[in-house]
Amino acid sequence: MFGLKQFYQNEVRAKLAQELDIKNPMLLPKLEKIVISVGAGAHAKDMKIMQNIAQTISLIAGQKAVITKAKKSVAGFKIREGMAVGAKVTLRNKRMYNFLEKLIVISLPRVKDFRGISRNGFDGRGNYTFGINEQLIFPEVVYDDIMVSHGMNITMVTSTDSDKEAFKLLELLGLPFAKVR
């Protein structure tokens, strides 16, 4: 792998400065963190499945996952306060760039009928979120080891407040956005 962090520092920053007309290099947008999260849904009651979900995203991220707990009880969903409801991993620095490179080069091309990720995942504050329907697109996940097939949300947090600047950053990093029709 060619080193996405070096690619960002050597090429992407120069292109961003030119295209966005930013003179101060400290104001250039950068990727701050990537959060991978999974909601367990109906499987939240089964602790073995929760452990398996946490183990799966730990394998994918290369870092230990944290099991998330409900902050409030919700009777409609049969959830009690403190009950395990999902798992998440927050990646920064080297692990973040390694994961992003693996996602772009290996995993996303393995998605069936892949035509690019949606451009609609920006939140208005420069962060981008998209979902993956199945964890099997990652090479670390072995089919026989998973108990439940689940998807995941991937959120990329950038240092900018502008969706336009964040889009340009992610596009230059190589994220395959869907073509506009």
From Swiss-Prot:
GO terms for biological process: translation. The keyword Ribonucleoprotein applies. It comes from the Bacteria. InterPro entries: Ribosomal_uL5 (IPR002132), Ribosomal_uL5_bac-type (IPR020930), Ribosomal_uL5_C (IPR031309), Ribosomal_uL5_CS (IPR020929), Ribosomal_uL5_dom_sf (IPR022803), Ribosomal_uL5_N (IPR031310). SUPFAM superfamilies: RL5-like. GO terms for cellular component: ribonucleoprotein complex; ribosome. Keywords: Ribonucleoprotein, Ribosomal protein, RNA-binding, rRNA-binding, tRNA-binding. GO terms for molecular function: rRNA binding; structural constituent of ribosome; tRNA binding. Signal peptide: none annotated. Gene3D superfamilies: 3.30.1440.10. Part of the 50S ribosomal subunit; part of the 5S rRNA/L5/L18/L25 subcomplex. Contacts the 5S rRNA and the P site tRNA. Forms a bridge to the 30S subunit in the 70S ribosome. This is one of the proteins that bind and probably mediate the attachment of the 5S RNA into the large ribosomal subunit, where it forms part of the central protuberance. In the 70S ribosome it contacts protein S13 of the 30S subunit (bridge B1b), connecting the 2 subunits; this bridge is implicated in subunit movement. Contacts the P site tRNA; the 5S rRNA and some of its associated proteins might help stabilize positioning of ribosome-bound tRNAs. Belongs to the universal ribosomal protein uL5 family. This is Large ribosomal subunit protein uL5. It comes from Helicobacter pylori (strain Shi470). The gene is rplE.
